């Protein structure tokens, strides 16, 4: 199955920890404020495509999973026509947030189920799976 997600792909990197004054509680927050909207966009794309999404009793892939993801990144004005997105965010951190969102949406039980992975970062109009705006094309195959 194929999902198309519109929105700015966001990396899930390190978390920041801090202690709330007057308490002994530590709080962890994402280092990027864009992670939550990106994960919500991925989850929404899955749920719009497949009504099973988000229900723990309705996991789509219970076995091994093949994943193919093409992220379309915004093209900087300074980028040449034949340029590739060789800058941040890191591809592996983009995949981390996207795989976690697919898990939350009920595509698979755990991102450890992903046994094969193809991933790319492109600019709009650069290739078959590029979108005209930032986002991602995600192909999932239950093996």
Predicted region positions:
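Acidic, proline/glycine-enriched N-terminal capping motif
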Residues: 1-143
């Amino acid at each position: 199955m194929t999902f198309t997600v519109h929105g700015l792909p966001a990396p899930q990197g390190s978390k920041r920890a801090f202690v709330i004054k007057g308490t002994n509680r530590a709080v962890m927050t994402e280092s990027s404020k864009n992670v939550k909207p990106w994960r919500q966009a991925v989850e929404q794309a899955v749920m719009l495509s497949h009504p099973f999404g988000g229900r723990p009793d309705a996991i789509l892939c219970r076995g091994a999973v093949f994943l193919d993801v093409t992220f379309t990144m915004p093209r900087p004005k300074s980028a040449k026509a034949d340029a590739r997105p060789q800058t941040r965010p890191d591809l592996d951190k983009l995949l981390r947030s996207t795989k976690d969102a697919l898990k939350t949406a009920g595509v698979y039980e755990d991102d450890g189920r992903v046994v094969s992975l193809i991933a790319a970062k492109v600019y709009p109009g650069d290739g078959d799976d590029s979108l005209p705006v930032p986002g991602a094309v995600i192909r999932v195959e239950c093996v």
